[in-house]
């Protein structure tokens, strides 16, 4: 089962107008030629959900936002569970995504879990497979 790869405990760059932390989800369903997080993409992660929740508890009153990034956070089985944990602690949630798991995104949006989405448009259709190593353009 995929886990979280790592946590950046403090950032003022990754979530506009927020003091935030970044939860880096292991794994990705693409293999982009320009990926700068290949270690995250190729990992199964080593941080359990309970450890992430413990971190969130310790950051209440210190942060006002959490960023889910990766890899591809929406491909991870922990995504919705951790999004609910983030919102239950009254943090704003930003999601960095390649947009290929639209049903998961719809569910999260429907539950009011996501406050900000950064959608990474990888390439036009004719270049998509060559750049991403995937056939996910139509899903995007």
Model-derived features with residue positions:
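N-terminal [4Fe-4S]-dependent radical SAM core
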Residues: 1-24, 31-43, 58-62
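Short aromatic/hydrophobic contact patches that present stacked aromatics
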Residues: 22-24, 67, 94
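Short, small-residue-rich loop/turn micro-motifs
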Residues: 25-29, 121-123
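Conserved active-site and cofactor/substrate-binding residues in soluble primary-metabolism enzymes
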Residues: 27, 47, 100
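Hydrophobic packing within well-folded, soluble alpha/beta domains
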Residues: 28, 32-35, 86, 95
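Glycine-rich, highly charged phosphate/nucleotide-binding loops
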Residues: 45-55
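Conserved AdoMet/S-adenosylmethionine-binding subsite of the radical SAM
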Residues: 55-65, 74-140
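Short glycine-centered, acidic/aromatic-flanked micro-motifs in structured strand/loop junctions
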Residues: 70
């Amino acid at each position: 089962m995929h886990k979280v790869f790592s946590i950046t405990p403090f950032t003022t760059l990754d979530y506009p107008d927020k003091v935030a932390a970044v939860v880096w989800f292991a794994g990705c369903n693409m293999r982009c030629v320009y990926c700068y997080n290949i270690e995250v993409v190729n990992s199964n992660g080593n941080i359990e959900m309970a450890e992430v929740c413990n971190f969130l508890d310790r950051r209440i009153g210190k942060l006002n936002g959490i960023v889910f990034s990766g890899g591809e956070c929406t491909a991870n089985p922990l995504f919705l569970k951790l999004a609910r944990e983030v919102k239950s602690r009254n943090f704003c949630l930003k999601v960095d995504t390649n947009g290929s798991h639209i049903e998961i995104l719809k569910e999260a949006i429907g539950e009011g879990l996501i406050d900000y989405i950064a959608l990474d448009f990888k390439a036009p259709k004719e270049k998509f497979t060559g750049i991403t190593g995937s056939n996910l353009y139509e899903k995007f």
